[in-house]
Design a protein with these regions (language model features):
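N-terminal targeting/docking segments
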Residues: 95-96, 149, 163, 176
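Extracytoplasmic/secreted proteins, especially bacterial periplasmic and envelope-associated proteins
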Residues: 106, 110-114, 153-156, 160-167, ...
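Metal-dependent active-site segment of extracytoplasmic phospho-/sulfohydrolases and closely related
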Residues: 160-191
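His/Asp/Glu-rich, glycine-adjacent segments
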Residues: 1-129, 138-145
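Short helix-terminating capping/connector loops at secondary-structure junctions
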Residues: 125-130, 176-180
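Alpha-helix capping and helix-loop boundary segments enriched in small/acidic/polar residues
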Residues: 102-106, 145-159, 184
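Structural motif
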Residues: 132-136, 184
Length: 191
């Protein structure tokens, strides 16, 4: 039978992507920093429990930092908007650190890490039956701020999204071969 998995920063995106007959839908718990799912799809996979025990964001959040990927001169925005480079760390504001991580482009790296673990440790893509892996990345405003407040962050998010997609393609090439992949990219239109 076909395997259907969904990995997303948010619960609704994961569940909607896996559908009613999926094998698993996983998202980052905004309170614990661990990947979670729902019992609707059956048992929680051993590989994700193992991942959570040593590699989930809650182990690395203190070292995570989001700075501009490119020199500040490569970002464009209105002159009256902030032109000072941003720097976000996620170990502060204890109650919101994972929510803020989820609304940063760093969450897309986390989605890729879990995706790679799924590809390595599950049976998805390992037989002649077509499987579905639905990946959701985040490309919205940081911490739900206005575009005016975070113009540089938005541009950086898109630059990092490009890198995340490139890493995903490299991963798929090495794990299952791109000749065996049908890739569809769409926007939800909401953040």
């Amino acid at each position: 039978a076909a395997l259907v998995y969904a990995i997303a920063p948010f619960r609704d995106a994961a569940v909607l992507s896996a559908g009613h007959s999926g094998n698993g839908a996983f998202w980052l718990n905004h309170q614990t920093g661990k990947w979670c799912g729902t019992t609707y799809y059956g048992e929680y996979p051993w590989w994700l429990s193992q991942y959570n025990d040593g590699q989930s964001p809650d182990f690395r959040i203190k070292e995570m930092e989001w700075n501009p990927l490119h020199p500040i001169t490569s970002y464009t925005f209105l002159p009256e908007w902030r032109t000072i480079p941003f720097k976000y760390r996620f170990e502060t504001e204890k109650d919101n650190k994972y929510r803020r991580l989820i609304t940063s482009p760093l969450i897309n790296d986390e989605v890729n890490r879990v995706t790679e673990d799924l590809l390595d440790k599950s049976n998805i893509g390992k037989d002649d039956i077509t499987d579905l892996l639905a990946i959701t990345y985040y490309a919205g405003n940081y911490n739900h701020r206005s575009t005016q407040e975070c113009a540089m962050e938005m541009q950086d998010t898109y630059a990092r999204l490009d890198q995340s997609i490139a890493r995903l393609l490299d991963m798929l090439e090495s794990k299952v071969g791109l000749q065996n992949v049908l890739l569809c990219i769409a926007s939800t239109g909401y953040a």
